Amino acid sequence: MGDLGFLSKLLDQVQSHSTVIGKIWMTVLFLFRIMVLGAGAESVWGDEQSDFTCNTQQPGCENVCYDWTFPISHIRFWVLQIIFVSTPTLIYLGHAMHIIQQETKLRARLSSPGGSRLCKQPKYTNEQGKVKIKGNLLGSYLTQLVFKIIIEAAFIVGQYYLYGFIMVPMFPCSKKPCPFTVECYMSRPTEKTIFIIFMLVVACVSLLLNVIEVFYLICTRVRCGSRAHSHKITSAENPASLSSPRWPTVEDSLKQNKMNMELETSQSIGGSLDGAKEEKRLLSH
């Protein structure tokens, strides 16, 4: 199973660009799919065709019956399942890496001389380069989750229609060139059934984690939106709490001008009265 090594290295980079549930999904994928499939599948399914026997001597009958019973090997089916389920995640990884690269260049321009005049600011990463899943990145993340759910469910249904979930020990076969309905036998059917059920349970857990993560992201988004909306309402009802200064209106300016004129008039009248009193005092002397 060395062909999955490169895929494992790529998926390992997704850990830093995922939610907590996404990290759990990656753990399930690595431990219970890639590692178990690589360690135990070959020993369990290595004799799948060599020990498939039919009670006939007709040349070609066993090969035809095996091909009819197993259109695709279980191992190859599960490898394809891992690759197809991981593809949306790898596409999201490419999108996230592109955004990180763009914002790294933007931070370099902002730190350069004259960069403070730039209006655009980094949106998806912080100073440490940690990705914030929001905006277009959130849409990309939700899209890859939806595609993983669809692909996972399709492979589970496909496995049921191709093989079923139980490996029976005997298969009747009447395909040509078999001269009659022959009976074909599979080695170690119980062990293979246990392995099939295990891989099915892991696929269902993976599907459930993807569904939970979709609801988690949607609920988090709705909660953040409601907080922002309530903050706007509170600020509108209590203007004094706003940090920006309150600019005077036209009505305020007119009131201020009227008060200034009244003050000047009262000061001029007061000055005239004081002058008349002083003149009268001098004449009396």
Swiss-Prot record:
Coiled coil: none annotated. One of its GO terms (molecular function) is gap junction channel activity. GO terms for cellular component: connexin complex. The chain crosses the membrane at residues 20-40, 77-99, 149-171, 195-217. One of its GO terms (biological process) is cell-cell signaling. Keywords: Cell junction, Cell membrane, Gap junction, Membrane, Transmembrane, Transmembrane helix. Signal peptide: none annotated. Induction: In ovaries, hormonally induced at the onset of oocyte maturation. Residues 264-285 are annotated as: Disordered. SMART domains: CNX (SM00037), Connexin_CCC (SM01089). Disulfide bonds: none annotated. Residues 41-76, 172-194 are extracellular. Residues 275-285 have a biased composition (Basic and acidic residues). It is a multi-pass membrane protein. It comes from the Eukaryota. InterPro entries: Connexin (IPR000500), Connexin_CCC (IPR019570), Connexin_CS (IPR017990), Connexin_N (IPR013092), Connexin_N_sf (IPR038359). Residues 2-19, 100-148, 218-285 are cytoplasmic. It is found in: Cell membrane; Cell junction, Gap junction. One gap junction consists of a cluster of closely packed pairs of transmembrane channels, the connexons, through which materials of low MW diffuse from one cell to a neighboring cell. May be involved in ovarian follicular maturation. Belongs to the connexin family. Beta-type (group I) subfamily. A connexon is composed of a hexamer of connexins. This is Gap junction Cx32.2 protein. The lineage of its organism: Eukaryota, Metazoa, Chordata, Craniata, Vertebrata.
